[in-house]
Amino acid sequence: MHKKIARWVQDKKSGIKRAVVTAYDYPFARLAAEAGVHGILVGDSLGMVVGGGSDTLGVTLEQMAYHTGMVVRGAGDCLVFADLPFGSYEKGPEQAWAAAVTLLRAGADVVKLEGGAEMASTVAFCTERGINICAHIGLTPQRVRQWGSFQRQGTDADSARRLQADAGALAEAGARFLVLEAVPDALAANITRDIAIPTIGIGAGPDTDAQVLVIHDLLGLGTESPPFARRYIEGGRIMRDALAEYVREVGNSEFPPRRKR
């Protein structure tokens, strides 16, 4: 097992929490690494956060590889996760493995895919062939057009049992990590307790082994943030004020300063 991953597994056993951010480029990856963040996810959410799209479905494998390379160059010792985008892995294990290799060649340590027990054979195939897989259940954004909206999952007894079964099947298949998104806190806590691999929560309460937030959300760079996100600063306002000051100084001939020679 990769020594970085082994450290995460040991931290789960010891009750030590890990902090992950979703980032898409070198400058933000470098800031995260310098701040002591433990993991960086190169998410297909780049299609929404930096691409302005309404969902993640238009993101390509080539785009994911490009952004993964940028993040890796700034990530330092952070564990780097990268998303397999919609359409790059659902046909079967062979397609998923080939797509995952592309992201590994871009520098990713772990490749993430969405889906429950139906993806267990794909997880096993990739794991047996040298790919570290992070599974993702609960709210899986790549299915938004099937559901019609981004909605919480596991809120009734039947769906909660199904998600618990999914978690067990994916862990048994060899997944190294499991993302739990937008599920009830108690369900996330139960799954975290029941499986040996580290869980990473987003909108899933405080009891997962790690938490992940989009770096733009926690820095206050977007106009809106998900209800589970915390804006640690109003970075967008600070940046707008700086840009407005630049515009003012240029307009008043204060910048650049006049040189004597």
Curated annotation (Swiss-Prot):
Top EC category: transferase
Keywords on record: Cytoplasm, Magnesium, Metal-binding, Pantothenate biosynthesis, Transferase
Cell compartments where the protein resides: Cytoplasm
Catalytic reaction annotation: 3-methyl-2-oxobutanoate + (6R)-5,10-methylene-5,6,7,8-tetrahydrofolate + H2O = 2-dehydropantoate + (6S)-5,6,7,8-tetrahydrofolate
Binding site for 3-methyl-2-oxobutanoate: 44-45, 83, 112
Pfam family, one: Pantoate_transf
GO molecular function list: 3-methyl-2-oxobutanoate hydroxymethyltransferase activity; magnesium ion binding
EC id: 2.1.2.11
Name of the protein this chain belongs to: 3-methyl-2-oxobutanoate hydroxymethyltransferase
Gene designation per UniProt: panB
